[in-house]
Swiss-Prot record:
The active site is at H175 (proton acceptor). This is Malate dehydrogenase. Keywords: NAD, Oxidoreductase, Tricarboxylic acid cycle. It catalyses: (S)-malate + NAD(+) = oxaloacetate + NADH + H(+). NCBIfam families: PRK06223.1 (NF004863). Catalyzes the reversible oxidation of malate to oxaloacetate. It comes from Pseudomonas putida (strain GB-1).
Length: 309
């Protein structure tokens, strides 16, 4: 990939930039933020760290929209982070106009770029970005499930004592309290999770995964998760930049999959050099479909709320 721009030089954007630059996932990396000098300073720091790691990725930062020119991929992390006691929806009224301004800049300066939305509430903002972009769903999608899956794997490893490397997990639906962890698809070394944990233990892991972001927020007091989201972004960027055809969860615009249309939901997708190559529709049992529908109904209400703003 030639040029990647991260819009939002906060902790998440910076964490992602560090990995992207270190791993040379693009030739040119831009950190863009309304606080131009902050973006410049962080970009210089990231660039110097990348050089120390043997990377040739060129990193620079600033505030001007023209910095988007020629971007192959734009990652949007800008917006206010959650504070203790806030839900992702609480920040919608603040982050929506920020996203709208960014999308206007992208349309003017990088109309062919792929757009990866990370800002919360990610389901609603991904839908908004897609709806105003004029692009197909292959070019506009969001990050949530990679992070949620990693959290679940951590909690399973903690509970069982097994290596997280041997754990597979899968999360669908909205990002937050309405997410749908598919425990039937969770395994440790190809052995179903139910072989190792009781139903009660599994439900505790599910609930902790749903509250994973809030748990970190409550403990840190002054900031939300940043390092794990940064790694999740870098994983998705790697899949796109290197055309890996990886199956990763992403917030995608559904077009009839899982019985839903015109909505952005977390589902397993194939990420390749063209962006989101396709949505994978898994067979769900009646209980799983009911949970997915409940999650979709909540996201649909959130989208309606967004449209009313």
């Amino acid at each position: 990939m030639n040029k990647l721009t991260i819009v939002g030089a906060g902790l998440v954007g910076e964490a992602a930039a560090q990995i992207i630059a270190r791993d040379e996932l693009c030739r040119e990396l831009v950190l863009m933020d309304v606080q131009g000098e902050l973006a410049q300073g962080k970009a210089l720091d990231v660039w110097q760290a990348a050089v120390e790691s043997g990377s040739d990725t060129r990193v620079y930062g600033g505030a001007k929209a023209e910095m988007l020119d020629g971007s192959d991929l734009v990652v949007i992390t800008a917006g206010v982070p959650r504070k203790p006691g806030q839900s992702r929806q609480d920040v919608l009224s603040i982050n929506l106009p920020i996203l709208d301004g960014i999308m206007t800049d992208i349309k003017h300066h990088a109309p062919a770029a792929t757009v990866l939305v990370v800002s919360n509430p990610v389901d609603v903002l991904t839908y908004r970005a897609w709806s105003v972009s004029g692009l197909g769903r292959d070019k506009v999608f969001g990050q949530a499930g990679v992070l949620d899956t990693a959290r679940m794997k951590c909690f399973i490893a903690e509970q069982t004592g097994f290596s997280a490397k041997d754990i597979t997990a899968l999360v669908l639906g909205g990002h937050g309290d309405s997410m749908v962890p598919l425990m039937r698809y969770c395994q440790i070394g190809s052995v179903p999770l139910s072989h190792f944990l009781s139903s009660e233990q599994i439900e505790q892991i599910v609930e902790r995964t749903r509250k994973g972001g809030g748990e970190i927020l409550g403990l840190k007091k002054m900031g939300s998760a940043c390092d794990a989201p940064g790694v999740a972004i870098a994983q998705m960027v790697d899949a796109i930049a290197n055309g890996r055809n990886r199956i990763l969860p992403a917030v995608a615009i559904l077009q009839g999959e899982y019985g839903r249309k015109d909505i952005a939901m977390g589902v397993p997708c194939v990420l390749a050099d063209e962006g989101l190559a396709r949505v994978i529709e898994l067979p769900l049992d009646a209980q799983e479909q009911a949970m997915f529908d409940q999650s979709a109904d909540q996201v649909a209400r959130d989208i309606d709320e967004m449209k009313a703003l």
